[in-house]
């Protein structure tokens, strides 16, 4: 049996704003496959390579007009994830950048406060990928997206009340040390009660 899956990611379009959640190593292929030509922001759930490994390919969204004008892609993440982006893609932040590097602008998320991309309010939802490793989910209107969650505190789960769509990870049937299994994901769904 072959594993043909791609790394998890989501694209949300609302109020004229296009947002991608996570840009793993398959980011370029995913964008080509869907024919996306414009991107306003990328929200990062955490700094693991399967969620940030494709950030170099945002360069395709930097120069889409003719004559070419630089369109920076805005990246939103918690402090720890931003630190890894700065380290892993240091050439994008160099004083003397070479031509063609990704043009990105980083924005730090305070998980206690909503933030905006254009006219779209985004509510960060904090959880844990493992005992000591934080991960951020996002609520955009009536949609919420949580990936690589293992635990979520009651106050954070409350941010999900009133959602119509809850996309949540469920790695497998058996328990796992750093991801919800199916029973845990279903328990969160029952707790939150999305439509």
Which residues does each predicted region cover?
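Core dinuclear metal-dependent hydrolase active-site scaffold
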Residues: 1-34, 105-158
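Active-site metal-binding motif and surrounding structural segment of the metallo-beta-lactamase
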Residues: 18-77, 162-165
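Short glycine-/acidic-enriched loop or helix-start segments at secondary-structure transitions
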Residues: 30-32, 53-55, 86-87, 134, ...
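Short, glycine/charged-enriched secondary-structure capping and boundary segments
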Residues: 34-36, 56-60, 89-92, 137, ...
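Structured loop/turn residues at beta-strand edges in well-structured enzyme cores
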Residues: 37, 102, 118-120, 161, ...
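Active-site neighborhood of divalent metal-dependent phosphoester bond hydrolases
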Residues: 69-72, 81-106
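Cap/insert and terminal regions of metallo-dependent hydrolase folds
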Residues: 151-195
């Amino acid at each position: 049996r072959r594993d043909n899956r791609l790394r998890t990611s989501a694209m949300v379009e609302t109020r004229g704003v296009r947002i991608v959640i996570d840009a793993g190593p398959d980011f370029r292929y995913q964008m080509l496959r869907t024919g996306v030509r414009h991107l306003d922001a990328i929200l990062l759930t955490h700094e693991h390579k399967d969620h940030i490994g494709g950030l170099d390919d945002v360069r395709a969204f930097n120069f889409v007009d003719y004559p070419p004008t630089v369109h920076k892609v805005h990246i939103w993440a918690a402090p720890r994830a931003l630190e890894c982006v700065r380290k892993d893609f240091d050439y994008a932040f160099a004083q003397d950048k070479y031509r063609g590097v990704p043009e990105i602008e980083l924005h730090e998320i305070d998980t206690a406060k909503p933030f905006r991309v254009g006219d779209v309010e985004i509510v960060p939802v904090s959880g844990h990928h493992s005992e000591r490793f934080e991960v951020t989910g996002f609520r955009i209107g009536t949609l919420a997206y949580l990936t690589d969650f293992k635990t979520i505190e009651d106050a954070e789960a409350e941010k999900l009340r009133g959602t119509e769509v809850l996309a949540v990870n469920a790695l497998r049937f058996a328990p796992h040390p750093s991801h919800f299994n199916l029973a845990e994901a279903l328990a969160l769904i029952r707790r939150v009660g999305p439509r």
